[in-house]
From Swiss-Prot:
Record-linked Pfam families: BRCC36_C (PF18110), JAB (PF01398)
Lineage per the UniProt record: Eukaryota, Metazoa, Chordata, Craniata, Vertebrata
Encoding gene, per UniProt annotation: BRCC3
UniProt-recorded name of the protein: Lys-63-specific deubiquitinase BRCC36
Description of how the protein assembles with itself and partners: Component of the ARISC complex, at least composed of UIMC1/RAP80, ABRAXAS1, BRCC3/BRCC36, BABAM2 and BABAM1/NBA1. Component of the BRCA1-A complex, at least composed of BRCA1, BARD1, UIMC1/RAP80, ABRAXAS1, BRCC3/BRCC36, BABAM2 and BABAM1/NBA1. In the BRCA1-A complex, interacts directly with ABRAXAS1 and BABAM2. Component of the BRISC complex, at least composed of ABRAXAS2, BRCC3/BRCC36, BABAM2 and BABAM1/NBA1. Identified in a complex with SHMT2 and the other subunits of the BRISC complex. In the BRISC complex, interacts directly with ABRAXAS2. Identified in a complex with ABRAXAS2 and NUMA1.
Organism: Pongo abelii
EC number(s) from the headed UniProt entry: 3.4.19.-
Motif JAMM motif, residue range(s) on this chain: 122-135
Length: 247
């Protein structure tokens, strides 16, 4: 029995100007990842009517298939300066997030629309467009504060194997909670045994990696203590001999 997963956001509408800014920022360097924040609005609607006017048929199809439509509209982006020294990591500081929120409030007053920080974007130079485990964990952290928060990834500086030409891929993603073991009722016995053996093997490997150095340290410490005890016993015997000679 398949488990249907319902995400907090059903679609994302990225303005062309914001898309060009993200794309140019991603193509600005191939040596490290770049990042930024997205400003826009989140529309909630329980009807599938013409309120959302899109030129693409894909957006319209999504709006027709769901009962409660939650669509993120990204109108502007803010380019951020890197704060992580690792080239394959990006990190948004609280100060940067606060400054982006202030800018969103300014745009809200200027346009009269409920602008706010609705997501973040970053680049993947020379690697796949799919989010890494770090990206998924970071996205989950943001979604704890705002379920409508989305993440965008721009994969660039990659070559099409067939045409030998460069291409740029981009995607939008959100994090979801993993299925509980009780939901996996469709697994057969062989799969369960295999999963159990893999889990046991990984657990033993982790325990060995943790307990191995600890046991070695305890053995070295025991050897040092025994040697020190012998030295103390020898010193005690020498002192007893000196004491007996004085008597």
């Amino acid at each position: 029995m398949a488990v249907q997963v319902v995400q907090a956001v059903q679609a994302v509408h990225l303005e062309s100007d914001a898309f060009l800014v993200c794309l140019n920022h991603a193509l600005s360097t191939e040596k490290e990842e770049v990042m930024g924040l997205c400003i826009g609005e989140l529309n909630d609607d329980t009807r599938s009517d013409s309120k959302f006017a899109y030129t693409g048929t894909e957006m319209r199809t999504v709006a027709e298939k769901v009962d409660a439509v939650r669509i993120v509209h990204i109108h502007s982006v803010i380019i951020l300066r890197r704060s992580d020294k690792r080239k394959d990591r990006v990190e948004i500081s609280p100060e940067q997030l606060s400054a982006a929120s202030t800018e969103a409030e300014r745009l809200a007053e200027l346009t009269g629309r409920p602008m706010r920080v609705v997501g973040w974007y970053h680049s993947h130079p020379h690697i796949t467009v799919w989010p890494s485990h770090v990206d998924v964990r970071t996205q989950a952290m943001y979604q704890m504060m705002d379920q409508g928060f989305v993440g965008l990834i721009f994969s660039c500086f990659i070559e099409d194997k067939n045409t030998k030409t460069g291409r740029v891929l981009y995607t939008c993603f959100q994090s979801i909670q993993a299925q509980k073991s009780s939901d996996l009722t469709h697994l057969d016995s062989v799969t369960k045994i295999h999963n159990g053996s893999v889990f046991t093997k990984n657990l033993c490997s982790q325990m060995s990696a943790v307990s191995g150095p600890l046991l070695q340290w305890l053995e070295d410490r025991l050897e040092q203590n025994q040697q020190h005890l012998q030295e103390l016993q020898q010193e005690k015997e020498e002192l007893m001999q000196e004491l007996s000679s004085l008597e």
